[in-house]
From Swiss-Prot:
Co-factor requirement: Mg(2+)
Full protein name: Orotate phosphoribosyltransferase
The protein's Enzyme Commission number: 2.4.2.10
Record gene name: pyrE
Native source species: Novosphingobium aromaticivorans (strain ATCC 700278 / DSM 12444 / CCUG 56034 / CIP 105152 / NBRC 16084 / F199)
Reactions this protein catalyses: orotidine 5'-phosphate + diphosphate = orotate + 5-phospho-alpha-D-ribose 1-diphosphate
Function: Catalyzes the transfer of a ribosyl phosphate group from 5-phosphoribose 1-diphosphate to orotate, leading to the formation of orotidine monophosphate (OMP).
Keyword Flavoprotein found: no
GO BP annotation list: 'de novo' UMP biosynthetic process; pyrimidine nucleobase biosynthetic process
Quaternary structure annotation from Swiss-Prot or TrEMBL: Homodimer.
Positions with a binding annotation for orotate: T121, R149
């Protein structure tokens, strides 16, 4: 899929939002990708996962034994990536603030894992998920995501294969441009308080 086709999928599902958003990283942005909306259509989710899987070099793809994604945002795309790769998919979650495998999920020692996210901005959640996977005995050999908001700047400590890399600027709270500072931020992500 070309970048225009990918963004067309986001626009068609009303997943590309504009306004003032407080990201889960604590940074602010005028753009937000609500991947839950783009993934709510199973056929679209399947297409995007297949295109993301195709970004991973064939020799590396064949080594992947499990897909693990962080809840909540990564659950659907992680499942679809498991389908695209023909391997089981599971997720880590934060019942007490730290990612861990639950619900009977387990990894065999040394099992080769692809960590899958929906969106990566600073990489904090991804690195936390990778740490949890390694603590559970898995070996993370690569990471993938629908969207790399860092436009290639993020370092996850493993090879990283995003479907698309976007450069939507993000800002620290004390560096907001006037147009964002003039409006209240909306916190739409998975770490938002109800």
């Amino acid at each position: 899929m070309l970048e225009d086709e990918i963004l067309s999928e986001f626009r068609a599902s009303q997943a590309l939002l504009e306004g003032h958003f407080l990201l889960s990283s604590g940074r602010h942005s005028a753009h937000y990708l609500q991947c839950a909306r783009v993934l709510m259509d199973p056929m679209r989710a399947s297409r995007l996962a297949a295109a993301t899987a195709a970004k991973i070099p064939r020799d590396l793809r064949h080594q992947i034994q499990k897909v693990v994604s962080p809840a909540m945002g990564g659950v659907i795309i992680g499942h679809e990536m498991g389908r695209a790769l023909g391997v089981e998919a599971m997720f880590v979650e934060r019942p007490t603030g730290t990612f861990e495998l639950r619900r009977g999920f387990a990894l065999n020692p040394g099992e080769k894992v692809l960590m899958v996210e929906d969106v990566v901005t600073t990489g904090l959640s991804s690195r936390e998920a990778i740490k949890a996977i390694e603590q559970a005995g898995g070996e993370v050999i690569a990471a993938a995501a629908l969207v790399d908001r860092s436009a290639g700047a993020v370092d996850l400590g493993v090879p990283f294969f995003p479907l698309v890399a976007l450069n939507f600027p993000t800002y620290a709270p004390d560096e907001l441009p006037p147009e964002l500072a003039a409006t209240e931020a909306v916190k739409p992500g998975s770490r938002a308080k109800p």
